[in-house]
Amino acid sequence: MIKSSLLIVKGDNSMLKCRDEVLFFTKQLVQIESIVNTYGEKEIAHVLHSLISSFPYFKQHPSYLVKSPTIADRLDRYNVLAFVKGTKEGGKNDTVILIGHIDTVGIDDFTQHADLACKPDELLKALKQEPLPDLVRKHAESGEWMFGRGALDMKSGVASNLYLLKYYSEHPNELEGNLVFLAECDEEDSSNGILSALNDLKLWKQEHKFDYTAAINSDFVAPRHAGDENRYIYKGTVGKLLPSFFITGAETHVGSCFEGLDPNLIAAELTRQIDYNPELCNEALGEVTHPPVSLKQTDLKPVYTVQTALAAYVYYNFFVYSWSPADVLLLLKDQAEIAFRNALSLYRERYHRFCERAGDVPREIQWKPRILTFAEMEETLFAAYGKEYKDSMESFKESLLLDDSLDARMYSARVVEEAWKWLPDKSPAIILFYSSLYSPRVEITGKNKREAKLIAALDRSVKEIQPSYSKPIVIKDFFPYISDMSFVAISDDETSLAAAAENNPAWGSKLTVDYDAVRALNVPVINLGPYGMDAHKKYERMEMHYSLEIVPNLANLVLKYVLEG
């Protein structure tokens, strides 16, 4: 293995000569097919643990490296954590955490090249033999891009962190505080990895007196628009909610369709009202989130019948920078009412036109928009039925947990469907709730000493590196993708988090997040990761110069400046 060394570049900067070693680590990791929720997650943790255990430092200090199982997980998965204690004179307990996930999304999109998806060199050769979009062709032939699942998202980021762990294990005398390496599983689905790792970080804080000063996440960055040449670093991260709508109508035989109300009509109007709606973009610190978009829209009929559906179910991705879960519920109740009114207006207009053509006399339409949050519905049912309702629903939830085919989203829908049966008033309605965990927003503004020090360290690092790199390195406030950054710091207050829990039917059974553990860690975090394009797509690729050389050096400088003084 290549010995970590320094490369002197123009100016007064000294940069780590790290490209070959980070490339070596990246290829090792990419070649392990570690798709989320598969055995591969376990395999990559074993390999990574074995690799780190071969470093001389960890042979001397084996207790500084752990392979830690995830908690309350139906799968046998592990995180890998390691730390180096600095021995530089004047060192303190200040500790920086390097974070990266080792799982990937699936490889079905690689179609005929699926067997090469995790073999970067072979994949590149195969891609060059087929028609490619112009930009992809240019990158494939340049020699400066690595293709393959996980090359960008985010095994090259983990490789960068691994390089720094190895470097400081060889040079602890250059480290003024402590360095923690965390490679977690399950980032691409439910964040069980990072949520489990909170316990290990807490334990090390107690045992080794670590004072967690900052965290650097190494997830990928990408162009924000066509022709964008910037390489971005992000302070904090976007938050993500999954607002969901259980919609009931009035069932009828399709031969008497105007005697009922199809919930799919309301669902369609709801999607028309919410999908891509710029009014639902959240602006903060001069940045704007992407608008919501639907991730599922269906009725809940299990089989074909000629009766209209009893209920429909839709949910939407929803990003936030400053809005709380309570804010989003209020906002979407208004949107749901607009959609309901639009659906009834369209229904009336078409009903009257039909009656004119058929020679029928239209009846008066009695339905009115009716919107309830899950918490409001539960409050009504607890008041009406008390313990009877509570005991029945707890038993129902327990029985649902036995069905492994239900993810948290469909589990939540079934709970709402069951609760709906208890309501005396069965007139058409929309029940609004959350059906997945809330990934909290993180806002890093310099509001305390730790945030201010991290921001100053980042600014200084970019200023020093920029003369050695031709592309602009730009710092922005919010990482625009979902990441595990959401679970190392927290910007929401307890009331906001309570709104997310109280309106989540799966909370406490299928889903639980210990936000108190996140708040206990509450370390300011930035994202400084590899650059590339087409993450989660078959042309996923990582630009090597920035990712393998600039990123490790930037992270090293941030680490150094956070810990010094």
Where do the protein language model's features map onto the residues?
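Short glycine/serine- and small hydrophobic-enriched flexible loop segments
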Residues: L162-E170, E269-Y276, N556-K560
